Structure formats: structure tokens, C-alpha cells
Swiss-Prot record:
Protein name (Swiss-Prot/TrEMBL): Protein I5 homolog
Source organism per UniProt: Fowlpox virus (strain NVSL) (FPV)
One Pfam family cited in the UniProt record for this chain: Pox_I5
Places the protein is found: Virion membrane
NAD is among the record's keywords: no
Induction (record text): Expressed late in the viral replicative cycle.
Bilayer-spanning residue ranges: 8-28, 53-73
Primary residence: virion
């Protein structure tokens, strides 16, 4: 049972890392002048996706980093015991 729990935690953290990488890229893309506006002008769907990713990344980035840091501290604590 413990192995299944650890596996699910690892899978969840991996998904969270991938989401944080995507949201971080979305935030960086917003900072590059011209790219965001040209993509949103060229395709309505791409503009909506970028807008959603911008909102999602703003909401998700800080809590995601805190969750990853807490998992890292927990892992270090378990190794020391």
C-alpha cells in the first residue's frame, strides 16, 4: 500500500512540475513584446488559449511552487530519519 501511495505522489508531483513549466512559459511569453498580440490576432482560438493560460498561470504559479517545496522538504526529512 505504501508503494502505491508513493507512486501516486510521484505522478502527482510530476504533473504539477509539467503544469508549472507550461504556466511559466506562458508568463514569459507574455513579456516578449509583439508575440502575444500577433498570436492572438492571427487565431481566435490561440488567443483564447493564451488568455486562459495567463489567468491559470497567475493563479497556479505561487501555490504550485509552495506545494513542490513542501514535498521536497518532506522528502529530505524522510531521508534523514
Amino acid at each position: 500500500m505504501e508503494i502505491a501511495r508513493e507512486t501516486l505522489i510521484t505522478i502527482g508531483l510530476t504533473i504539477l512540475v509539467v503544469l508549472l513549466i507550461i504556466t511559466g512559459f506562458s508568463l514569459v511569453l507574455r513579456l516578449i513584446p509583439g508575440v502575444y498580440s500577433s498570436v492572438s490576432r492571427s487565431s481566435f482560438t490561440a488567443g483564447r488559449i493564451l488568455r486562459f493560460m495567463e489567468i491559470f498561470s497567475t493563479i497556479m504559479f505561487i501555490p504550485g511552487i509552495i506545494i513542490l517545496y513542501a514535498a521536497y522538504i518532506r522528502k529530505i526529512k524522510m531521508k534523514n530519519n
